[in-house]
Amino acid sequence: MNIGRAIKVTQAVVDIKFEGELPKIFNALKSKLKYKDKELVLEVSQHIGDNIVRCIAMDSTDGMSRGDEFVDTGAPISVPIGRSTLGRIFNVVGELIDECGPLKGKYNLEPIHRAPPSFTEQRIQEEVLVTGIKVIDLLAPYLKGGKIGLFGGAGVGKTVLIMELINNIAKAHKGFSVFAGVGERTREGNDLYHEMITSNVININEHEKSQAVLVYGQMNEPPGARARVALTALTMAEYFRDRENQDVLFFVDNIFRFTQAGSEISALLGRIPSAVGYQPTLATDMGAMQERIASTTSGSITSVQAIYVPADDLTDPAPATTFSHLDATTVLSRQIAEMGIYPAVDPLDSTSQSLSAEIIGEEHYNVASEVKRILQTYKSLQDIIAILGMDELSDEDKIIVDRARKIQKFLSQPFHVAEIFTGMPGKFVSLSDTVSSFKGIVEGKYDHLPEAAFYMVGNIDEAIKKAELIQAEAK
């Protein structure tokens, strides 16, 4: 047993002196004493000479003192993987924090530091991941194994969108989801857990029937936990991709806090900061995690990463480094939410690299381009409408405005996870239905239908039925 003693404690950074063999970089050290009834786990970060290793604490160092003994585990932090993790909440070191008893069933332990898939393992076929959400599938489609940035303020429906994606992936693709709460508010994490129980994404009576795993490193935890919790969650997601051949959804909220935690650690380790005070290894840290999110010959991990932009400055090194890894962006707009259109995705601001004829096909590409053109024209005409009114527009512009308003309404959709709040049954719309429905609208086939018929429906057949009901009620 290789035992070392603490010789210096500086908040989240601890120096440990070993008499025998030095532990390797990234090895986990466990305390022999318990602090607040828990073992403290440290991760070796630097060898600084004189048989001393500098470590990052994964929990609070309150109550620790010089001379306390730590045991080298001989391996990196290792966390449970397997189906038994479904429906449970873990912390950064793989301990359960949901107070629902121990893990049931088989599971293995895997280290959180792993190499990304090799070139030969990676799948180069570009395949669209159908989410069943019209606005995403039509205008900013997700690729299997892609990375999506989710931008949205408080109260615009980010959590509901995340939960609907989890629900649809589970039902349509029989896939699982892993959620990493990085620097989350504890209240938000608690709310998400209870909302998942309400919407049957998590089954607390039979955990094996759940569709998601939650891993939390909350805002009140030391930077070590916040910097590693995304890797813990990613390790659990890799199991479903590599061993169960699944298409996994991996959520990170918030990727900025992952960078922020790395910056705090870097300063405590005494590294010279780079631009705007960030760690000099910012690009390396980000790349090490993002490269593990990929499609392989076994399955795929598609990540949706919520991104906070400091002071709305997109050139800040943290969001700028993240952008270089993204394949698509989904922007939630408060203006659209205020109009009562949910999901409140901005169709003109959201982008996707897969929106090209080679990947999604000629028909889909042409329909998406025409929808964007109509919406953009409507946006540019809004000032004229506000000042002079609709009567001053040309006949052609009036038709465009009418179609744009129908498209805007048709981009709304009732969600399965919101059924209990709205009373409307949720709709999963297939990609072919989405494309053909919007094709009909832009070609003018449904110009005779009232605008209200397009609001909160699935495909165009439902809009036609709704129009018939509206006309029947009017009589």
Swiss-Prot record:
Classification via InterPro entries: AAA+_ATPase, ATP-synt_VA_C, ATP_synth_F1_bsu, ATPase_a/bsu_AS, ATPase_alpha/beta_chains, ATPase_F1/V1/A1_a/bsu_N, ATPase_F1/V1/A1_a/bsu_N_sf, ATPase_F1/V1/A1_a/bsu_nucl-bd
Residues given in the record as ATP binding sites: G152, G153, A154, G155, V156, G157, K158, T159
SUPFAM superfamilies hit by this protein: C-terminal domain of alpha and beta subunits of F1 ATP synthase, N-terminal domain of alpha and beta subunits of F1 ATP synthase, P-loop containing nucleoside triphosphate hydrolases
GO cellular component, one term: plasma membrane
EC numbers, comma separated: 7.1.2.2
Oligomer status and interactors: F-type ATPases have 2 components, CF(1) - the catalytic core - and CF(0) - the membrane proton channel. CF(1) has five subunits: alpha(3), beta(3), gamma(1), delta(1), epsilon(1). CF(0) has three main subunits: a(1), b(2) and c(9-12). The alpha and beta chains form an alternating ring which encloses part of the gamma chain. CF(1) is attached to CF(0) by a central stalk formed by the gamma and epsilon chains, while a peripheral stalk is formed by the delta and b chains.
Role of this protein: Produces ATP from ADP in the presence of a proton gradient across the membrane. The catalytic sites are hosted primarily by the beta subunits.
Record-given protein name: ATP synthase subunit beta
Gene: atpD
